[in-house]
Amino acid sequence: MYLDQYKIKGTLNLDGHKCFHDINTYPAFQQDLEKFKDHLVSLVDNKESATFFKFGDGDYYFLTQQHVGSAAPGARALSKSFNDIDMSKFTSGANLCDYYTCEIYPENRDKFKQVIDKKINYPAEYGYGLVGNKWFFEKFKGRIGLIGASEKLYLTEELMKYDEYKEYLGLDSFVDYIHYPQKWAADDIDMVEEFVGEQLAKSTADIFLLGIGHSKCASLHTFKKYKNAIYMDVGGGMDMIAGCINTRRPYAGDWINFRIPDYDYSQIDYLKYNFANEKML
């Protein structure tokens, strides 16, 4: 069992990484969690505009052009070869966000330092945990939008038609659904920026939760051009909201994956989904 030091109230963490068993991994975890929450509330209440980039090992492999996992051409972000796109847009863009989060895994923090010349502001686990315990929904009710893969946003919109699901989230609605390509977004990042920018220009949310894959390296920092808001990259937290999270992911252990009867899930690009904690609506 992970140490109390790394618990986030209202969640269960089944991630077995040894860093959660070492008090020296991140001694200020609880104190910085409160600072993070206060920081977000202040930013949103003051109508600030800022981007939070969540770094994962896949972003490292993408930025260093390695054929590993989701970063590999043909897997998710890119259908072309790395040589067929302008990688400088991604390597430079990844350094242009306002704040950075990264898991407390020491190996991921080492990878971050190799490709991004910025400091890590907060653990990425905060984003997962505050989706998992619904803090985001409680704190920013009526002000929160989503940016993510169209297929998962369509699914989330359907889930939000059910009172049981709205009660589970403690939320009546998301004020905006900003669609983003589920696959191959890095093939033509300028087209993606235009597509997303047109939607953002018409949006009303004060804070967006988002999960948009490795192409965010080039696109995330541009969002502020189209809409003043807080852009909070929660990565796999978007899979929680869509009811398809692998419960072994950090702080997703007791999340209920609500499922819709007769819904066509064949178009959903699952991220190692383990079909656990499912409940049919």
What are these model-predicted stretches?
Residues 1-170:
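Electropositive, gly/pro-rich neighborhoods at or near active sites that engage anionic ligands
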Residues 35-42, 84-88, 188-200, 215-217:
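A short, acidic, amphipathic alpha-helical segment used as a generic capping/interface helix at domain edges
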Residues 101-102, 146, 176-179, 233:
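Structural signal for conserved beta-strand scaffold positions within catalytic alpha/beta enzyme cores
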Residues 151-152, 214-216:
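Alpha-helix capping/helix-boundary segments
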Residues 170-206:
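A mid-sequence, solvent-exposed acidic-amphipathic segment
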Residues 207-211:
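Short catalytic-loop micro-motif centered on adjacent basic/acidic residues
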Residues 215-281:
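C-terminal functional extensions of proteins
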